[in-house]
Amino acid sequence: MENKKSFFHLHLISDSTGETLMSAGRAVSAQFHTSMPVEHVYPMIRNQKQLAQVIDLIDKEPGIVLYTIVDQQLAEFLDLRCHAIGVPCVNVLEPIIGIFQTYLGAPSRRRVGAQHALNADYFARIEALNFAMDHDDGQMPETYDDADVVIIGISRTSKTPTSIYLANRGIKTANIPVVPNVPLPESLYAATRPLIVGLVATSDRISQVRENRDLGTTGGFDGGRYTDRATIMEELKYARALCARNNWPLIDVTRRSIEETAAAILALRPRTR
C-alpha cells in the first residue's frame, strides 16, 4: 500500500521566466519522497508593488520561498518580509554569484534574465508568461480565443503551475476553476483556437492538498466542505461530466509531475490542429 504523502507550499519568485527556479526546486524536492510540493510560481516580478502582492499570498499559504531576483533592494525587501512572517527564504543564485565574483575578481552585471539569449524564442516565452498571468484563475475571459491551451479543473488540480510550465515553453495558457453549478464563461465555448483540457485527481490527493492549504490559512476560512472527500467527489463528478459533454480531454494528475502533465497536454495538441 502506498504511503500517505504530506504536502508543503513551495513559493518560487523570479524576475525572469522562473525556469531556473523551477528546475532547482524540483531537483531538491525529489530528494524528499514523503513530501510533495504545492508549487506557486511568480515569474516576471520586477517591482515592489508586484512583490508585495506575492508576499501577501505567501502569508496566506506559508511555506519555503526560493527566489532569483538580481535587484538587491527588492531581494532585501523580500528577505525582511519573509523573516517577519516566519518563513524560510533563499536567494538561489546569490551564493553562486558570490563564488564567481571572488574567483574571477570581478563584479557581476546584475542584469535580469542575463542567461537568456534575446531571440524570438525568448520573447515568445515572455509573451506567453504574461498571457498566463493575465489569464490565471478565470481572469480575462474575453480573450480565451487567443490562447493555445485552456486548462479547466476544480481547486488544487495543479492548473496554475502547469500553465506557467507551458508558458515557459512559449505556449499561451489560460486556466479556469470549475465550481459545480457555476457556468463557465460563454467565451470559452465560443473559442475555436485553443485546446481545452480538464485536469482531475483522486479525491484523496485533492483532500490532502486542500488540508495543507487549510492549515496555512488564518481565520475566516471554513475548510470543512473544502476538504471533505464526499464534496470533492461531487466536484470531480461535475468536472468529468462537463468535459464529457463538451468532448474535452481529461488528464488525471494524481501521479503525474507538472512536467508529465504538461507533456500529456502537448501530446494532445497536434490532434486539435
Swiss-Prot record:
<dbReference type="Pfam" id="PF03618">
    <property type="entry name" value="Kinase-PPPase"/>
</dbReference>
<dbReference type="GO" id="GO:0005524">
    <property type="term" value="F:ATP binding"/>
</dbReference>
<keyword id="KW-0418">Kinase</keyword>
<dbReference type="InterPro" id="IPR005177">
    <property type="entry name" value="Kinase-pyrophosphorylase"/>
</dbReference>
<dbReference type="InterPro" id="IPR026565">
    <property type="entry name" value="PPDK_reg"/>
</dbReference>
<dbReference type="GO" id="GO:0016776">
    <property type="term" value="F:phosphotransferase activity, phosphate group as acceptor"/>
</dbReference>
<dbReference type="GO" id="GO:0004674">
    <property type="term" value="F:protein serine/threonine kinase activity"/>
</dbReference>
<keyword id="KW-0723">Serine/threonine-protein kinase</keyword>
<feature type="binding site">
    <location>
        <begin position="153"/>
        <end position="160"/>
    </location>
    <ligand>
        <name>ADP</name>
    </ligand>
</feature>
<comment type="function">
    <text>Bifunctional serine/threonine kinase and phosphorylase involved in the regulation of the pyruvate, phosphate dikinase (PPDK) by catalyzing its phosphorylation/dephosphorylation.</text>
</comment>
<keyword id="KW-0547">Nucleotide-binding</keyword>
<comment type="similarity">
    <text>Belongs to the pyruvate, phosphate/water dikinase regulatory protein family. PDRP subfamily.</text>
</comment>
<protein>
    <recommendedName>
        <fullName>Putative pyruvate, phosphate dikinase regulatory protein</fullName>
        <ecNumber>2.7.11.32</ecNumber>
        <ecNumber>2.7.4.27</ecNumber>
    </recommendedName>
</protein>
<dbReference type="GO" id="GO:0043531">
    <property type="term" value="F:ADP binding"/>
</dbReference>
<keyword id="KW-0808">Transferase</keyword>
